[in-house]
Amino acid sequence: PTARAEALWPEVRAALAQLRAAFDPGEFQPQLEPASFRLTMSDAISTTLMPQMVSQIESIGAQTNLRVVPPATLNPRAMLERDEVDVAVGHFPDTVASIGVEGRAATLRHRRLYDSQYVCVMRRGHPLAGRALTLDAYCEAHHLLVSFSGSPFGLVDETLGALGRTRRIVLTVNQYYTAGRVVARSDLLTVLPAFFVEATGRRADLVEQPLPFELAGIHVEMIWHLRHDRTSAHRWLRERLVEAAAAALGEVPAAGPEDV
């Protein structure tokens, strides 16, 4: 395609989406209407939500298929803009902040599914497991970082830098399951959202400790493009994700029908 065609495609795609929405037959009937959706989320979030999603689909005999792919970056905007995925689920603070700044002109929408706090995770029997974790002890230890990009610098390192401290990242991995297995069999420390520890599959082998510094909480959001905002099938999908989070975690933050 020419550069001109590529430049026009987002506008054409948006117009087509509006046309589809205009002819949307109304309430989606999952038992009668085959549908496939692509979602992007980490393995930890998938472990939390997908068992509940599959249970919902199977229990009502829905002709619905889900395709889950890993996030390429910490900002899913490009995947959503290019219509590569229908929904992104994860902790995307920069994306959510930009949606707020854009206001009515925003092309993305979001809704919070659940909240969590970060904890320091180590193997059971680790020398630091039996006592309060100090900042000095934390910084002197060796660390594992879950990094989708492979960069050995994350939110914790930014926070430590503000305190004039650093840590050594011995290993970066891109899966929480892998992180749990490595930490359970080494003296490495890692920092995970508390809800994600279960996704490592090694909870019985791990110990959680409060962090020796302040770290903002994690907010797991689902984000979708405006083109799918009012399509009945996509609304049905998002409602199922909200229910899956409620069933898996026991609580969904109070909010309007689809937030902002």
Question: Residue ranges of each PLM-predicted region?
Answer:
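Alpha-helical "hinge/linker" immediately C-terminal to small N-terminal DNA-binding modules
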Residues: P1-F28
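Secondary-structure junction motif
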Residues: H91-D94, M122, L128-L135, C139-L163, ...
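Flexible hinge/capping segments at coil-to-helix
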Residues: P30-Q31, E102-H143, H228
